[in-house]
Amino acid sequence: MTVPPNVTIAEARYAANDAMTLTQEYIARKLKEARKNEDDSDGYAEIPVKANTRLKCAAVLVPLAFSGGEWHLLFTRRTDRVQSHKGQVSFPGGACDEGETTPEQTALREAEEEIGMQRGDVQVLGQLSQLITISSYRITPVVGVIPFPYAFKVAGVEVARVFTIPLVWLSDHNNYWEFLLRDSERSLITYHPFDGELLWGATARMTVTFLKTIGTLTGK
């Protein structure tokens, strides 16, 4: 891995600590603590979930990359040729294949298929709480550190662009907002555009959940 073992990000905008040391070990510990304290009511559902609700299994990779002296999250923008979520910003991921027994298997396979990220190049740190989407998927986000830069090989039918956004920018409460949807108990999270890309919806919620878990969000 090309990521330094101990990376200090000194930014006054970080609420948890102005000189927070965001190491891989720290992030992994916070993810483990969050999952340990979860119960069945944790997570977020975009639809009412009843006893007879049939949910499809899915997983995404939340890729952490170290570049320019700071951590970034890596995203993709989907093409207009995919069946769903055309042109939207997302994490690499998708539905579970038959025979896959863990979210990690699904997330790493999808990342390899979509952006050419070899499974052995990802250092998995942990998982976030599950998210149930309006399309009836139960998504498990898998957080992993990736080498960067990287010789990505994108699946041209699915992925239009691969890009990163700094954690510092994502953690700034001035860059996103959450609002309740009309006639609904659900809310929507959306970010201001970054480098021409709009991060919103389920991917934005997973992003904010990750930032809350590691303690970098400011002001909210």
Tell me the role of every PLM-derived stretch.
Residues M1-S90, A95-E113, M117-P149, L180-K220:
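N-terminal leader/linker segments that precede catalytic domains of diphosphate-processing enzymes
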Residues V154-D195:
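NUDIX/MutT-family hydrolases
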